[in-house]
Structures are given as C-alpha cells and as structure tokens.
C-alpha cells in the first residue's frame, strides 16, 4: 500500500498548474447520460474518483474514450474525454460500484429523466457524517417521481408522461441535490423552479454545460434556479472549470512552508473568501495573467477565525487544510464547521505532529505552536489527508502519511507538483 513521505523544512518556489475541478467534472460526466449524442469534456483531472465514475457510466452503456496529453513534462494530465450514451443498457447502479463513491448516486437524476426509471444503491464515499439522500428523494418526488427504498436501493419511477416541472425549495443548501434536480428537470414537462439552491461555481459550470446541450436554465449562481424542460438534449463540448479546492490547498501549503509560487490556470474569483483568510494569515496574494501568486517570506503565520458556509462562504472542503495552517500560527484561532458533522477526524492526527487542538461541539480551538515534529499519521478522508501533508511541510523531520488512496481521489499528482516547487515529498510503497 502506498504512503506519502514528507521531510519538512523546505520553502516552495515555482509554478503549480491547477487541474480541472473534480467537484465539477463528476456531475458533468453524469450529465452525459441525458443525451444520446457525444458530450466532450476538456480539462478532466486524472483521479481515482473520475476513473470509478467512468466504470459506473460504462455499466449504464456509455461509450467512453480518453485523449490524454502530457503537460509540463509529465507534471499533470489535462485530459479530453468523450462520452456517448447512445443506448442506456442498464438503469441499475449496483452497490459494488456506488458504495465506493458518493457522487455516483447522482446518476439517479439523468436515468430517471431519460429512461423513466432508476434503481440506485444508497451511496458510499467519504466517512463524513451521515450525508443523507433525503433532499434528493424529496426533490425528485416533487417532480412526480414515485420513490421507494428497499434493500439498500432507491427505486425511482417517473409518471407515464415523464417528470413534471414543479417548484421545490431545498430545506437546506445541498450542492449534490441541486446538481441532480437541475439535471432531472432539463427533460421534465414544464418549468421547474429550485429555491434555496446551491450557488457554488460547480453548479454554475454544470448549468453552462447543460445549456450548451440545449437545456434552458437561468438563475444559476443565485439561490433561485429556473429550468424550462425540453424534449431532448444534444451533444456539446465543454471545458471543466479550475479546481478551487486544489487552488486553496496549494495556497495554504505555500503559506505554511513559506516561499513564492504561482498557481496557474485558476481564478481568484472562485475562492475569494478562502484567499482573504489566507491573506489575513500573513500571505501576500495577487492575481497574474494566468492565475494567482502566493508569497510568504519571513513573516509569521497569524491566527484567523473561520466559519465554513455554502458558497460564497469559506468552503468546508478547505477547513482541514486551514486547520493545518493554523497549527503554526502565533496565537489562538477558532474553526467552526457548519456544513458536515464529524468533519474533525484530522484533529487527532494533527495532534500526533504536536498540534494543540481542542473541540467543543462544531468548533475547534487551535493554539498555534512554535514547532511541529514529524510522525507517522493516517489519512481519514480526502481533505483531512491533505491537511496532514500541509502540516508535514513545516514539521521537523519525517512525516509518513498512510492510507493515501484518499488523496488519490481528489488531488492529481500532488507529490509531483509539490516536489517541483522544492518540497521533499515522495510516494513510497510497502
């Protein structure tokens, strides 16, 4: 089993290209099930979750081809992937596939809209709280679907004439449920209005792609999204937007280790709140023609309080990384998680490196320390795993991170990108 070995103490200097966003690529790939034409996606990251979803889509009958080209001397892949779902051969998404990745549950929307039925296993993925599918089920039922849960599967059936446009207000903001209902509503009869919808850039990116396929969606990026149903969707070509979570992660890595790095092929507007928190922590941040420049030379890390919130608030997917940064601050910071319960599993592992963190409900109190010391640590989920890498960059000696398959789900060639900027990070196999 692979592990990541980090020897701390090196500053980061150079250029890091930012990959396409995993959180955008997954719903875009699933949207290919809505049409019998070819959907071509550019800038698709090479990640374990993407490969798993390719297998799932293939199970439904999608024909998938990949044209990869190496960029920057093998540093990363920017792949173009073609999806053609001319015939849906199965409307069942089995447990053995869906259990490995939560987002694969989202196929329920396109399958139900196009084929009138879907049988999808309840999902797996990161062990972050319960993350129930109630909102998906309630929303699809509002569009006229008959839904039953039996034997760990969600069985959904559309009315004889297809799904019916309706008004549905999410009781809480959900990116995944917004994705699913937006996709399902594109082929519904009539108009659907989604209230309290997620405003995340990935939702906007999906709507942009669906509109290119012939959908009629407006209001994306606001809390009210309107979808006028159409009879069918066509193929399209779409470029996946930059990964704002990867952008924020590497920005925090530079703030932690010190140095001067340009993050290429990304946009500051995708994560203004997070960048402002990093700036307040002591890093200098400026926009360049191709991305963002992060500099921290000499100045210490300042304590900053953050509260996670739906976009445009501080992203929950950057909470663990920011906690890693705060372990070396010059004071006390408070980090409050409002999106998911049980998303502090990284606290015990950071403590193994010498961090001083105490929990009270959904708030972590982080007392900055003058030094961290390398130790063996274990990744518990995707974002927690990279927080350990960030901490390891500033720790004295060697940090060995095990269970790095979590990292491979969401970070493309992380060790290579950091190494090219001067970090001592390597993948080792037992």
Swiss-Prot record:
Catalytic reactions of this protein: phosphoenolpyruvate + UDP-N-acetyl-alpha-D-glucosamine = UDP-N-acetyl-3-O-(1-carboxyvinyl)-alpha-D-glucosamine + phosphate
Modification 2-(S-cysteinyl)pyruvic acid O-phosphothioketal occurs at: 126
Residues at which UDP-N-acetyl-alpha-D-glucosamine binds: 102, 131-135, 172-175, 317, 339
Enzyme class at the top of the EC tree: transferase
Primary subcellular site in the record, as a coarse category: cytoplasm
Compartments where located: Cytoplasm
Keyword Cell cycle part of the UniProt annotation: yes
Tagged with keyword Cytoplasm: yes
One GO MF term attached to the UniProt entry: UDP-N-acetylglucosamine 1-carboxyvinyltransferase activity
Residues the record marks as active site: 126 (proton donor)
Pathway connected to this protein: Cell wall biogenesis; peptidoglycan biosynthesis
Superkingdom, taxonomy of origin: Bacteria
GO terms for cellular component: cytoplasm
GO aspect biological process, one term: peptidoglycan biosynthetic process
Family: Belongs to the EPSP synthase family. MurA subfamily.
Protein's recorded name: UDP-N-acetylglucosamine 1-carboxyvinyltransferase
Origin species: Rhizobium meliloti (strain 1021)
Organism lineage: Bacteria, Pseudomonadati, Pseudomonadota, Alphaproteobacteria, Hyphomicrobiales
UniProt gene name: murA
